[in-house]
Amino acid sequence: MAAAMPLGLPLRLLVLLLVGRGCCGCAEGPRDSLREELVITPLPSGDVAATFQFRTRWDSDLQREGVSHYRLFPKALGQLISKYSLRELHLSFTQGFWRTRYWGPPFLQAPSGAELWVWFQDTVTDVDKSWRELSNVLSGIFCASLNFIDATNTVTPTASFKPLGLANDTDDYFLRYAVLPREVVCTENLTPWKKLLPCSSKAGLSVLLKADRLFHTSYHSQAVHIRPICRNAHCTSISWELRQTLSVVFDAFITGQGKKDWSLFRMFSRTLTEACPLASQSLVYVDITGYSQDNETLEVSPPPTSTYQDVILGTRKTYAVYDLFDTAMINNSRNLNIQLKWKRPPDNEALPVPFLHAQRYVSGYGLQKGELSTLLYNSHPYRAFPVLLLDVVPWYLRLYVHTLTITSKGKENKPSYIHYQPAQDRQQPHLLEMLIQLPANSVTKVSIQFERALLKWTEYTPDPNHGFYVSPSVLSALVPSVVAAKPVDWEGSPLFNTLFPVSDGSSYFVRLYTEPLLVNLPTPDFSMPYNVICLTCTVVAVCYGSFYNLLTRTFHIEEPKSGGLAKRLANLIRRARGVPPL
């Protein structure tokens, strides 16, 4: 009996460890998940838009739990949430401009350059300090110039940027928003963005993210969105959602050699070989709305796994769905090259005009005064709807608020809500928010005059004659929908439904950005200091050299020397002739 105890005790401990480990795994369940998708949309202008989204969900409360182990969720971003008490973070890098008039409403539009807006927890005491430190950290993570975000380009909107996730308190004191319109997006920003993906660029949809192809496009935008969401239907606990999105627009006539045909290999120079093994869903959607293979106008190959219909941005869409986890889709040819071919040239139809689009420009002459004008287009034939307009103007453009005019159809249009925060020289920019009602089938013009300020010579950029950028206007609106949509469960629906929030069946939310402006300021002639230095140095050198010679040299009178034998003989002959001597 005494000899059996040492053998039985380890056996019991082993059983307890195995049972405890199994029970812990059963109770905890999967704590994180990954879904990836690609939406390919032929645009009305003939271009092709491709939108990637990689959604990582982590069933963990980073604010309360001491998290030390990370599996799919990036550790760098998880530590940011914990250290700076973040509620939401939205960061985008964009090259180019989304042309709403020709490409239609965007899936996820972002302004040109870099945009960052963050909601902090209400436990943060010094929001400005956390904002500065966060922008510097993000600058290092994404190899960007976000460290140039300071008080001169940071604002706190009151109504334009509400939390997209769970929010018990919406006090705008904890919100910060900034745009760097002159930020240049390059491969150095894409590489760290891809490293945040669980499969990096080794498998799944991320193998298509080839830098030389993505930046050879008409439009390129990559973003990171972090927000808290409900873990279950009763919202008893919180999960964190990371959405990494990337949108590009290919010129079909360039990639297709003058034709509207396209394929994955032609656009990305690569094909799909396998799904990401860490993902629970990997789908490719091809927009075939308005086209049918029955009428023999186009051919989509290979045949899709299934088709899906839904109301997206107020329009009923039909998608061909390709599931990368379908063994028959990949194993037959070891690669998936989705392609669309037109059997006959498509009809040249008029481009559909979106219900809401905007345009912004600067007018005036000279370098003293000017005018900022924004045109808001409501193309709906019989529906009027309100638009929330946000303008952030640098401090060196001094706005004349009394010159603000809003006209629609030749009549004055008074905003129902207006918030203005004046600028302070070298401290904060102008902030102007207005809620404007756009009449049906109308063009509303918002204009305000400004005066250019004189900068210090140390405040000019390295290329001041190029001009100074003004961040674009932001439009937020509930646009009337053509087709009634029913709210769906975003967990049970396809992944891209989370990109397009539906408030009710009659309208949908959209956020648009206008073009960034380039304004010239009074610029001194920076070559004059060079000319003055050269002239001054020359004069000083000449004067100094002359005075130096006078002060350091000694002068002696040299006695004339008598001539030689020949000269004396010549003088004798001249005297004999009565001629003066030499």
From Swiss-Prot:
Native source organism of the sequence: Mus musculus (Mouse)
Q: Does the keyword Membrane apply?
A: yes
UniProt similarity note: Belongs to the PIGT family.
Q: Which Pfam families match?
A: Gpi16
List where the protein spans the membrane: 530-552
Report the membrane topology from the UniProt record.
Single-pass type I membrane protein
Q: So which residues have sugars stuck on them?
A: N168, N295, N331
In Swiss-Prot or TrEMBL terms, this protein is called: GPI-anchor transamidase component PIGT
Q: Which UniProt keywords apply?
A: Disulfide bond, Endoplasmic reticulum, Glycoprotein, GPI-anchor biosynthesis, Membrane, Signal, Transmembrane, Transmembrane helix
